[in-house]
Amino acid sequence: MNTIALYLLTAVAEILGCYLPYLWLRQGASAWVLLPGALSLALFAWLLSLHPDASGRVYAAYGGVYIGVAVLWLWLVDGVRPSAWDLAGVGVAFGGMAIIVFQPR
């Protein structure tokens, strides 16, 4: 699996693992949503271990992908259209991620 796909899958696992307990705590969903939420967070932790680079660099670069996926989640799941400020923030985060990922080695 390529690095970007791994980052995307990791971000979805983390967001889903946090969103499901939110549904239980704030939206009155059944406590059963905590089980897939816990599994999703376990998957997130395991996926982080698959990243091929130094962990600090991986977490820093992954942060840019997480921000992008979170704004996409805002739009697709929460039904809130991202503002120009949201999109600018994603662009800045992706720029920072690109500096970290594509640095000369």
Swiss-Prot record:
Main location per the UniProt record: membrane
* Highest taxon of source: Bacteria
Q: Check the record and name the InterPro entries matching this protein.
A: UPF0060
Q: Which Pfam families does this UniProt record tie to the protein?
A: UPF0060
Q: Which residues cross the membrane?
A: 4-24, 28-48, 60-80, 82-102
Keyword Repeat found: no
- Keywords, comma-separated and alphabetical: Cell inner membrane, Cell membrane, Membrane, Transmembrane, Transmembrane helix
Give a GO cellular-component term: plasma membrane
Can you say where in the cell this protein is located? Cell inner membrane
Spell out the family assignment given in the record's similarity comment.
Belongs to the UPF0060 family.
What NCBIfam families does the entry give? PRK02237.1
Name of this protein = UPF0060 membrane protein Reut_B3679
Please give the organism. Cupriavidus pinatubonensis (strain JMP 134 / LMG 1197) (Cupriavidus necator (strain JMP 134))
